[in-house]
C-alpha cells in the first residue's frame, strides 16, 4: 500500500471525478486576505468546510445515544462561520464530494492550525467505493468559544492505494453512509 502524490490526486479528480469541486493548487488567500489553506498538497488534499453546521445543545436534556440518536440534540446553523461553545461539539460537511476508487482507502487528519487552538477535527477513513459529502466532527477542547470557518481548509485527506483489490467494498455491503448529501447524523 502506498501513499499517492499530487499528480495522482490531480489525475483521478480531473479524469474520474474523485473530488468535486476539485482545486488543483494550494489556496492560501481569498479576496486579498490569508485563509486556512485548502486544495492539493504534495501527498494529500486539504478539504473545506461548507456553511452547514449542527451544534450540540443541552436545551432538551436528552441522552446522547448512537443507537437511538435524537436530532433535537443539535441546533442547525447556516453561516460563514460556526461558534462552538466551550468543551462542546459540532458537525459540518465538506464542500467537496468524494468518489473513492475500489483500490483506495483514505485517512483524514485535522489541520494543525485548528489543533493548535484546541479544536480537534475527527473524520473516519473513506472506504473503497464510498462516495458522498464527508461529515466532519469538531471538538472544542478549550474553556472558550471556538470559531470554525466555512469555505476554508479544516483537514487533510491522504490517499493510499492497495496492492490488490478488496473482495468487498463499502458500496458492495451497502454502507449506511453511502451517498450522504448533507451533515449526516449517527445511524445504527
UniProtKB/Swiss-Prot annotation:
One of its GO terms (biological process) is dUMP biosynthetic process. The active site is at residue 137. DCTP binds at residues 111-116, 135-137, 156, 170, 180. The keyword Nucleotide-binding applies. It is an enzyme of class 3 (hydrolase). One of its GO terms (molecular function) is nucleotide binding. CDD domains: trimeric_dUTPase. Pathway: Pyrimidine metabolism; dUMP biosynthesis; dUMP from dCTP (dUTP route): step 1/2. It holds the Pfam family DCD. Keywords: Hydrolase, Nucleotide metabolism, Nucleotide-binding. InterPro entries: dCTP_deaminase, dUTPase-like_sf, dUTPase_trimeric. It catalyses: dCTP + H2O + H(+) = dUTP + NH4(+). The keyword Isomerase does not apply. Catalyzes the deamination of dCTP to dUTP. Belongs to the dCTP deaminase family. HAMAP family: dCTP_deaminase. This is dCTP deaminase. It comes from Neisseria meningitidis serogroup B (strain ATCC BAA-335 / MC58).
Amino acid at each position: 500500500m502506498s501513499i499517492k502524490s499530487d499528480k495522482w490526486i490531480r489525475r483521478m479528480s480531473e479524469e474520474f471525478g474523485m473530488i468535486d469541486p476539485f482545486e488543483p493548487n494550494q489556496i492560501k488567500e481569498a479576496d486579498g486576505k490569508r485563509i486556512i489553506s485548502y486544495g492539493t498538497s504534495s501527498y494529500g488534499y486539504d478539504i473545506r468546510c461548507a456553511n452547514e453546521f449542527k451544534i450540540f445543545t443541552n436545551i432538551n436534556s436528552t441522552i446522547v445515544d448512537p443507537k437511538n440518536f435524537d436530532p433535537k440534540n443539535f441546533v442547525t446553523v447556516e453561516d460563514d462561520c460556526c461558534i462552538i461553545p466551550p468543551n462542546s461539539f459540532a458537525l459540518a460537511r465538506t464542500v467537496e464530494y468524494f468518489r473513492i476508487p475500489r483500490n483506495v482507502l483514505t485517512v483524514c487528519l485535522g489541520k494543525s492550525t485548528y489543533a493548535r487552538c484546541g479544536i480537534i477535527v475527527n473524520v473516519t477513513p473513506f472506504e473503497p467505493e464510498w462516495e458522498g459529502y464527508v461529515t466532519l466532527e469538531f471538538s472544542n477542547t478549550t474553556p472558550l468559544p471556538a470559531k470554525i470557518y466555512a469555505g476554508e481548509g479544516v483537514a487533510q485527506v491522504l490517499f493510499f492505494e492497495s496492492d490488490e483489490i478488496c473482495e468487498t467494498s463499502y458500496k458492495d455491503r451497502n454502507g449506511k453512509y453511502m451517498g450522504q448529501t448533507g451533515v449526516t447524523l449517527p445511524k445504527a
